[in-house]
Amino acid sequence: YILNFWATWCAPCVAELPTFVKGEKQYKDAKFRFFFVSLDFKKDYSSKVIPFIKKHLPESSVYLLGDSNYNSWINLVNPEWQGAIPATFIVSADPSKCKFFEGEISEKQLFDTLDTLK
């Protein structure tokens, strides 16, 4: 599983989304599942977030995380995570293959990591 935490107001998040969309298509047969978790504010869902998703992630699995108390759950996701976004977690059945990236991930980093897990 590839979990990407992002928001529409985060420029690096928006910049890396095309890489994930490309990866989602390129690694479809490898049975990777991509999930995009938006940390946008609830007040922006209908005016900004939903239109953005329809335009940029129309075929992707996107979740709107409405809990703005990030400090209450960030450590539960990954103790290494300081809370910055974008943040990407690559989860494998083999814990030794799990990866965490805080900050923008390049196409090479993402694809090289996925290639090692195929």
Regions inferred by a protein language model and the residue ranges of each:
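Short pre-active-site segment immediately N-terminal to redox-active cysteine/selenocysteine motifs
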Residues: 1, 6-9, 41, 84
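Conserved hydrophobic packing residues within short motifs/helices of P-loop NTPase cores
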Residues: 3, 35-37, 89
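Conserved redox-active cysteine motifs that mediate thiol-disulfide chemistry
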Residues: 5-22
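Thiol-based oxidoreductase modules, predominantly thioredoxin-like and allied folds used
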Residues: 31-46, 58-68
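Thiol-/selenol-based redox modules, centered on thioredoxin-like
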Residues: 85-118
